[in-house]
């Protein structure tokens, strides 16, 4: 993520506390009166931002020129134009059940191969034990 996005994200968390606070500092000398208003780093856009964000609040950051949206719950996008679907949130999680499906199949195939091997060895040894001993000479 870019640094500007991180700054904006942090700033939107504290926008409510600074949105309405504008501290005015007034200094007076015999000839000049100077009033300085403390402008918050992040503020609501005001009338120029009406309708900019479709489902959220429009904010203006002092350091980053431009309007940005803080989306309401359930919306996303640059202008909060996309609805976050429940199925989309579920699809982000890895599906672990499909990774276990091949395992029983592989185990069954291996057990079948082992059973065939054991059966063939059993038949071979049984056949060799039943053969008559014709070549054997009795003393």
Curated annotation (Swiss-Prot):
<keyword id="KW-0339">Growth factor</keyword>
<dbReference type="InterPro" id="IPR011170">
    <property type="entry name" value="GF_C11R"/>
</dbReference>
<feature type="disulfide bond">
    <location>
        <begin position="71"/>
        <end position="80"/>
    </location>
</feature>
<keyword id="KW-0964">Secreted</keyword>
<dbReference type="GO" id="GO:0007173">
    <property type="term" value="P:epidermal growth factor receptor signaling pathway"/>
</dbReference>
<feature type="domain" description="EGF-like">
    <location>
        <begin position="41"/>
        <end position="81"/>
    </location>
</feature>
<protein>
    <recommendedName>
        <fullName>Growth factor</fullName>
    </recommendedName>
</protein>
<dbReference type="GO" id="GO:0005154">
    <property type="term" value="F:epidermal growth factor receptor binding"/>
</dbReference>
<feature type="glycosylation site" description="N-linked (GlcNAc...) asparagine; by host">
    <location>
        <position position="34"/>
    </location>
</feature>
<keyword id="KW-0325">Glycoprotein</keyword>
<comment type="function">
    <text>Stimulates cellular proliferation (hyperplasia)and mobility around infected cells to promote rapid and efficient spread of infection.</text>
</comment>
<dbReference type="GO" id="GO:0005576">
    <property type="term" value="C:extracellular region"/>
</dbReference>
<dbReference type="GO" id="GO:0008284">
    <property type="term" value="P:positive regulation of cell population proliferation"/>
</dbReference>
<dbReference type="GO" id="GO:0045840">
    <property type="term" value="P:positive regulation of mitotic nuclear division"/>
</dbReference>
<keyword id="KW-0245">EGF-like domain</keyword>
<comment type="similarity">
    <text>Belongs to the orthopoxvirus OPG019 family.</text>
</comment>
<dbReference type="GO" id="GO:0008083">
    <property type="term" value="F:growth factor activity"/>
</dbReference>
<keyword id="KW-1015">Disulfide bond</keyword>
<keyword id="KW-0732">Signal</keyword>
<dbReference type="InterPro" id="IPR000742">
    <property type="entry name" value="EGF-like_dom"/>
</dbReference>
<feature type="disulfide bond">
    <location>
        <begin position="45"/>
        <end position="58"/>
    </location>
</feature>
<keyword id="KW-0244">Early protein</keyword>
<feature type="signal peptide">
    <location>
        <begin position="1"/>
        <end position="19"/>
    </location>
</feature>
<feature type="glycosylation site" description="N-linked (GlcNAc...) asparagine; by host">
    <location>
        <position position="95"/>
    </location>
</feature>
<feature type="disulfide bond">
    <location>
        <begin position="53"/>
        <end position="69"/>
    </location>
</feature>
